[in-house]
């Protein structure tokens, strides 16, 4: 038997928020900066380590105020965010089995969903070495099945097994992990949830308002 698998999480917060008109991650959502929702969603034992990767000093200050590890950088590519975040986690946990990449702008994503994804990856119980090795060659993405449509709506977060780390660290310029989902479709597993709203991001102030209405209705 091997020890249980270990999952890290990169919270991606390097976007420019062009459509939003301001730093959307700092916008108020139900009484707190929207990024705080990502803090709450990833505060689970299933995430052994997490880090926010950002180009914003204000976001850096927010992370520090909440005790969330943060990496400030000035690079522009999506590949840079992936590489910097994963590299930082691997420095902390060299034996990392998987890494989740979670956008900071999906405020309805809940902790239970993150736990479901990590449990699916870790298979809940310690397992034989060959089974673990197989799991580390898989990619888990979040999805939701809509009524009258058997094809799931898919999106983020996405959890990559460790066998994909070398390619994640050397992605093409300005490309993200979706490159690997297209390259290895047979290795992609979809973790479906009931509420498709968890997949929605807040790219505009109007979208943020709509998501806040949904959040208040749930409460």
Model-assigned labels for residue ranges:
Residues 2-57:
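N-terminal glycine-rich phosphate-binding loop and ensuing alpha1 helix
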Residues 2-5, 166, 170-219:
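Conserved alpha/beta core of the MobA/IspD/sugar-nucleotide pyrophosphorylase nucleotidyltransferase superfamily
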Residues 10-14, 53, 102-103, 143-145, ...:
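Short beta-strand segments
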Residues 28, 108, 158-159, 190, ...:
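Short aromatic/basic micro-patch
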Residues 29, 71-73, 142, 191-193, ...:
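Hydrophobic residues at beta-strand termini and immediately following loops
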Residues 36-101, 112-113:
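Conserved N-terminal catalytic core of the sugar/cofactor nucleotidyltransferase
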Residues 76-169:
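Conserved beta-loop-beta/alpha segment of the NTase-like Rossmann-fold superfamily
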């Amino acid at each position: 038997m091997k020890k249980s698998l270990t999952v890290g999480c990169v919270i991606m917060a390097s976007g420019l928020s062009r459509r939003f008109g301001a730093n959307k991650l700092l916008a108020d959502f139900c009484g707190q900066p929207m990024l705080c929702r990502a803090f709450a969603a990833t505060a689970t034992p299933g995430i052994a380590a997490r880090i926010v990767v950002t180009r914003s000093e204000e976001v850096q200050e927010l992370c520090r105020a909440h005790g969330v590890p943060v990496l400030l950088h000035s690079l522009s590519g999506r590949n840079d965010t992936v590489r910097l975040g994963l590299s930082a986690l691997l420095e902390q946990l060299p034996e990392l089995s998987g890494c989740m990449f979670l956008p900071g702008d999906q405020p309805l994503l809940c902790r239970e969903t993150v736990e479901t994804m990590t449990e699916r990856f870790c298979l809940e119980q310690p397992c034989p070495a060959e089974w673990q090795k197989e799991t580390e060659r898989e990619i888990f993405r979040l999805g939701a099945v809509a009524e009258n449509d058997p094809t799931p709506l898919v999106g983020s977060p996405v959890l990559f097994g460790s066998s994909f780390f070398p390619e994640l660290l050397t992605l093409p310029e300005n490309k993200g992990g979706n490159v690997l989902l297209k390259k290895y479709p047979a290795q992609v597993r979809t973790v479906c949830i009931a509420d498709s709203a968890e997949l929605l991001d807040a790219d505009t102030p109007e979208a943020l308002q709509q998501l806040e209405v949904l959040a208040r209705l749930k409460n």
